[in-house]
């Protein structure tokens, strides 16, 4: 069973991830993952620190992700389970893009996370975005 400290550290990891991707901190983004960590998103799968760093650096300028460039990741309803050095987490995701006087929600979905403690620090081993609504989604 995870301790309250473990759960707090995992919540902090989620927040550091959001801050890094929203502010263009590619090194900080990659550092939230294990060295062999994997991110599975709507524009592809990225594995390992070099690939993750390149994805984060390209995030704001890649035409495939243009709708997301100025958006903020809002994550809530985080549920963490696990034991020892392994954990899973579920959270709801909403991406909000500032538009003048208002903001608009441009993505709704959830994350499924697999986490591992490495050298005393929690990291994402795998983070999967399950997007239900986003620009360009034609449904299934």
Label the model's feature ranges.
Residues 26-93:
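A solvent-exposed, acidic/Ser-Thr-rich amphipathic alpha-helical stretch
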Residues 93-99, 117, 131:
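Beta-strand elements of well-folded, non-transmembrane domains
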Residues 99-104, 134-140:
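A short, polar/proline- and glycine-enriched secondary-structure boundary/capping micro-motif
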Residues 5-14, 53, 90-92, 140:
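Binding-site signature for planar aromatic cofactors or substrates
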Residues 1-32:
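Short, low-complexity N-terminal intrinsically disordered segments enriched in polar/charged residues
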Residues 73-75, 106-111:
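Short, surface-exposed coil-to-beta transition loops
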Residues 88, 108-138:
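Short beta-strand edge/turn micro-motifs at domain boundaries
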Residues 19, 63-68, 100-101:
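Short helix-to-loop capping/linker segments positioned immediately adjacent to catalytic or ligand/cofactor-binding
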């Amino acid at each position: 069973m995870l301790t309250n400290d473990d759960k707090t550290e995992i919540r902090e990891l989620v927040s550091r991830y959001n801050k890094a991707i929203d502010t263009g901190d590619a090194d900080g983004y990659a550092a939230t993952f294990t060295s062999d960590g994997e991110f599975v998103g709507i524009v592809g799968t990225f594995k390992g620190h070099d690939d993750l760093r390149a994805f984060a650096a390209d995030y704001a300028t890649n035409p495939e992700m243009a709708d997301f460039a100025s958006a903020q990741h809002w994550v809530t309803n985080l549920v963490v389970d696990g034991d020892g050095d392994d954990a899973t987490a579920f959270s709801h995701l909403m991406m909000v893009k500032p538009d003048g006087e208002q903001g608009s929600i441009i993505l709704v979905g959830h994350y499924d996370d697999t986490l591992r403690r490495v050298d005393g620090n929690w990291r994402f081993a795998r983070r999967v975005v399950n997007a239900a609504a986003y620009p360009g989604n034609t449904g299934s």
